[in-house]
């Protein structure tokens, strides 16, 4: 009888495992996670936790946001918190350290809400995690260094929170990491050495400073790079070796010097360098890339609000959306640009606030309705009405630049 009483807790435990099918440890962790979070909405239709009934026979099949392994006791392998629906305000509360008890977890996702507090450092014990996505909430504190010890981590997205501190230098040691999205936080310091096989890096809209990592420390595999809206400075020559880039956004920083010719190629179809301190001419593309000037549909290049000089080359003719305004370009607009505008291949061409002297209009041929062309505040009278009908409000109301400014500028450049 005494032996039976001693074994009774174990019998009950095994019975619970068999009945519910899920690991008791995982079930307890899910209970703690639910207790630390709450649905913002009071409507059961949009509420996430409505299905989390802990008396249910099999939470693995009835709980929203979880998937489990097949074998009993079932273990939670993915956890998605929130519905992710556009009409759902999401969750509030904090992330419970109990998440770390889900030792078989491979994916952890938190959808948009107002979850606050730090990211639990204990997440670093979940060695099978490949995806961490905790976006669009109000998470605070620094990025736990323990995250960068996860040997299988492929994707890390902590964007649109209120994270502070620096990016841990140990990020460079995580060779499995391919996607890092930390944009729209309050992260400061310099960009550390990055994993050698990184494909996607978004650090936009933070408080980062310093220069980009040296040329031999940049991942040659990078295809997407965005560091816009920081306090970064220095030359762009470190990007010359990044031949796999298809998207580049360095806008709203303090980068200086000339633009490497290797960046002007058709495969880099989205390039945003606006609002920096860039100087010099737009170079011809490298001779080693014969198709470099063939930009196709969907291509965008924004070099506006810099100090670029000289006459326009044919390098960017054919770009679908092209912003060259607020620079110091001179001379006549090349005919290739004009042909591209009239054919509708270039749908947006902003050249306002330069020192351009001529735009060779095709007499009697109207612009396509889909084209937005702005030529105001240059050293010419824009063709009427082509040159200013599609100008943004920021272009101002002056049609041409004052003659004395044009004369003084041409004299200084001679």
Placement of each model-derived feature along the sequence:
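Surface-exposed cap/linker segments adjacent to membranes
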Residues: 2-65
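Membrane-proximal ectodomain caps of single-pass cell-surface receptors
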Residues: 30, 79, 223, 242-247, ...
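LRR flanking "cap" motifs
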Residues: 38-94, 384-388, 403, 410-411
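The feature encodes a structural signal of leucine-rich repeats
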Residues: 92-100, 119-121, 140-145, 164-169, ...
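A generic tandem-repeat structural signature
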Residues: 97-215
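C-terminal capping segment of individual leucine-rich repeats
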Residues: 101, 125, 135, 149, ...
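Consensus "Asn ladder" position of solenoid repeat domains
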Residues: 113, 134-137, 158-161, 182-185, ...
């Amino acid at each position: 009888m005494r032996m039976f009483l001693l074994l009774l807790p174990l019998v009950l435990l095994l019975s619970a495992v068999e009945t519910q099918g899920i690991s008791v440890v995982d079930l307890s962790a899910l209970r703690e996670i639910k207790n630390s979070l709450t649905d913002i909405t009071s409507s059961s239709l949009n509420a996430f936790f409505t299905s989390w009934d802990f008396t249910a026979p099999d939470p693995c099949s009835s709980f929203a946001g979880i998937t489990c392994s097949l074998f009993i006791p079932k273990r939670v392998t993915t956890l998605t918190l929130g519905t992710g629906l556009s009409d759902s305000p999401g969750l509030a509360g904090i992330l419970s350290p109990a998440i770390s008890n889900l030792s078989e977890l491979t994916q952890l996702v938190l959808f948009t809400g107002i979850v606050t507090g730090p990211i639990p450092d204990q997440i670093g014990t979940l060695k099978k995690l490949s995806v961490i996505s905790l976006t669009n909430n109000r998470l605070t504190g620094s990025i736990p260094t323990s995250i960068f010890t996860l040997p299988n981590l492929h994707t890390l997205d902590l964007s649109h929170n209120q994270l502070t501190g620096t990016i841990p230098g140990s990020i460079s040691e995580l060779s499995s990491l391919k996607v890092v999205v930390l944009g729209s936080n309050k992260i400061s310091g310099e960009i550390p050495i990055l994993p050698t096989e990184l494909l996607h890096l978004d650090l936009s809209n933070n408080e980062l400073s310093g220069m980009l990592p040296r040329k031999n420390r940049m991942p040659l595999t990078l295809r997407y790079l965005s560091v816009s809206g920081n306090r970064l400075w220095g030359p762009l020559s470190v990007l010359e070796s990044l031949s796999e880039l298809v998207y580049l956004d360095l806008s709203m920083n303090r980068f200086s010097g000339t633009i490497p010719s290797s960046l002007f190629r058709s495969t880099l179809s989205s390039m945003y360098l606006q609002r920096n301190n860039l100087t010099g001419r737009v170079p011809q593309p490298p001779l080693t890339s014969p198709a470099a000037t063939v930009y196709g549909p969907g291509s965008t290049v924004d070099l506006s609000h810099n100090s670029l000089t000289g006459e326009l080359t044919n390098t960017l003719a054919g770009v679908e959306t092209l912003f060259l305004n607020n620079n110091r370009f001179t001379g006549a607009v090349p005919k290739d640009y004009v042909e591209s505008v009239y054919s509708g291949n270039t749908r947006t061409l902003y050249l306002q606030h330069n020192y351009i002297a001529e735009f060779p209009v095709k007499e009697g041929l109207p612009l396509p309705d889909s084209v937005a062309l702005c030529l105001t505040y240059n050293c010419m009278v824009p063709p009427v009405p082509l040159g200013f009908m599609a100008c943004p409000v920021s272009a101002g109301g002056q049609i041409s630049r004052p003659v004395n400014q044009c004369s003084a500028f041409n004299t200084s450049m001679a």
